[in-house]
């Protein structure tokens, strides 16, 4: 061996011996990453499992709170067949893109190619909630550490706003949850471009979320400088532009009446008076109760973060509206507020911890340290006090009752391909096989069958004489009753 070869040998041995060292370091990094993600994945899996069980059992037990699931089922079924997203429940030939600006629902078309059923929408919604729980938990662990981060993630996942949204069944705002969580997580971390990229699609989820994007853009302006501030301004302009385009151009053009329907729910003429506006925002007191719940789930600590401003557009349209259903805690209207509030909480904790110890008020520092268990306690207490997840520990929740059997029997009497007019009770269970109309809407053609749920049919108020009601709705027809059990009444058209 030459002297040069001998001299090169140690270098080769060093290079070879460095390979396992680098491999070991890489494996250690991967292992550390897996450990960091184990908590978020666990929270997401638990969230999906719990909500999927809740969704399936409620659906199997015919616990349907409204017609919305049926509307989305009809619309997406038509999209999947390359037709306009028409829902007969909303009206003959009614295009749902004239109801709300939510083109994001087109993403569900491949789902319907694989599994064309309303249950698929519930599964997708549960997945979206779980995905947002993953993002929030990951953000929380970054700021407050392992166990506290998981506690905050679980508090978010089972917050009252998300529980109510799940039992309200599918709505397009479910898509906003992971988008908001990811955008605000990036905002907290100072990743301005990432924040903007996740916020951009929110304008395609629902028209009012364009205003939420405006606030997110302004928050970027507030927190950044130079080009990043310009990025925030552009994001705010994007949100404002899409809001205007949606409510002034798209919705009136697609809506059969040439208007944005929901603009009628706000008395715009009274909003020029600041006193009137202030009164409408706080009266009746149900609005203040809702606000207390929204802030209370974070132990009110979220108020120390400017991110909390992102709730204002949603609260404004809800509280200024004349529609009482918007003021309270039920339904899905508070779902989009949950990721905002919990990311604001995480941001507030981060800000408190980032300040020098000498400048932190001792009480605030101590409170921020226990924010995770406080939020977890609030979530548990609210659930015990009557939130939907509590149903899962009741044995009766898993047992079918006489009403379930009656529902199955009455649905079996309606042949596939029939035209049916129904209240909200069983409408969702017919949309996959029949032409289904809502009986509270004028202008429907005379259906072959009219179905009423006399106990849980929602609105309109169930008629005492269904045959007479059907013949009054559709003059010149004759109906006969063919089923009347446990509150379900089915009549069939025989003439007309």
Predicted regions and their residues:
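Start-transfer (signal-anchor) and selected internal transmembrane alpha helices
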Residues: 1-53, 192, 227-235
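Signature aromatic-anchored transmembrane alpha helix within multi-pass, membrane-resident enzymes
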Residues: 41-45, 236-240, 352-387
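Transmembrane-helix signature of polytopic, membrane-embedded enzymes
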Residues: 41-42, 119, 131-158, 177-178, ...
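Membrane-lumen/periplasm interface segments of specific transmembrane helices
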Residues: 50-54, 61-64, 78, 226-312, ...
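Extracytosolic helix-loop segments that constitute the early lumenal/periplasmic catalytic or substrate-binding loops
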Residues: 71-95, 103-104
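Short acidic/glycine- and proline-prone juxtamembrane loop motifs at membrane-interface regions
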Residues: 165-173
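Membrane-interface transmembrane helices that cradle and orient dolichyl/undecaprenyl
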Residues: 175, 180-194, 221-222
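Hydrophobic/aromatic-rich transmembrane helices and adjacent perimembrane loops
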Residues: 309-360
């Amino acid at each position: 061996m030459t002297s040069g070869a001998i001299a090169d040998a140690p270098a080769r041995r060093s290079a070879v011996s460095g390979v396992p060292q680098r491999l070991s370091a890489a494996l250690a990094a991967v292992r550390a990453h897996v450990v960091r993600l184990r908590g978020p994945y666990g929270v997401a899996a638990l969230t999906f499992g719990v909500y999927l069980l809740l969704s399936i059992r409620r659906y199997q037990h015919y616990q349907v709170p409204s017609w919305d699931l049926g509307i989305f089922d009809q619309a997406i079924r038509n999209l999947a067949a390359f037709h306009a997203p028409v829902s007969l429940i909303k009206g003959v030939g009614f295009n749902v893109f004239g109801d709300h600006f939510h083109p994001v629902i087109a993403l569900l078309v491949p789902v319907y190619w694989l599994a064309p059923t309303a249950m698929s929408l519930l599964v997708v919604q549960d997945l979206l909630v779980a995905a947002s729980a993953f993002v929030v938990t990951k953000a929380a662990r970054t700021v407050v550490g392992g166990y506290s981060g998981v506690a905050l993630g679980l508090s978010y996942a089972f917050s009252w706003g998300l529980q109510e949204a799940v039992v309200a069944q599918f709505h397009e705002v479910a898509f906003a949850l992971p988008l908001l969580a990811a955008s605000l997580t990036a905002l907290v971390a100072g990743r301005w471009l990432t924040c903007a990229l996740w916020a951009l699609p929110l304008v395609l989820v629902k028209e009012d979320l364009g205003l939420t994007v405006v606030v997110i853009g302004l928050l970027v302006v507030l927190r950044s400088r130079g080009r990043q501030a310009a990025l925030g301004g552009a994001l705010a302009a994007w949100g404002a532009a899409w809001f205007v385009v949606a409510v002034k151009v798209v919705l009136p053009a697609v809506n059969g009446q040439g208007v944005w329907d929901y603009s009628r729910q706000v008395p715009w003429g009274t909003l020029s008076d600041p006193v009137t506006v202030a009164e409408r925002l706080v009266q009746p007191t149900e609005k203040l109760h809702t606000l207390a719940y929204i802030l209370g789930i974070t132990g009110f600590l979220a108020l120390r973060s400017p991110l909390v401003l992102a709730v204002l557009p949603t609260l404004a349209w809800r509280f200024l509206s004349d529609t009482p259903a918007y003021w309270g805690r039920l339904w899905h209207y508070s779902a989009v507020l949950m990721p905002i509030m919990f990311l604001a909480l995480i941001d507030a904790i981060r800000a408190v911890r980032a300040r020098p110890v000498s400048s932190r008020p001792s009480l605030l520092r101590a409170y921020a340290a226990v924010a995770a268990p406080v939020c977890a306690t609030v979530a548990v207490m609210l659930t015990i006090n009557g939130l939907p997840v509590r149903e899962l520990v009741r044995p009766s929740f898993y047992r079918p009752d006489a009403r379930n059997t009656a529902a199955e029997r009455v649905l079996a009497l309606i042949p596939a391909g029939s035209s049916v007019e129904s209240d909200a009770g069983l409408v969702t269970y017919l949309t996959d096989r029949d032409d289904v109309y809502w009986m509270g809407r004028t202008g429907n053609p005379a259906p072959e069958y009219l179905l009423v749920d006399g106990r849980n049919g929602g609105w309109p108020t169930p008629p005492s004489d269904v045959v007479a009601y059907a013949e009054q709705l559709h003059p010149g027809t004759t109906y006969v009753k063919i089923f009347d059990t446990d509150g379900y009444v089915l009549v069939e058209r025989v003439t007309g």
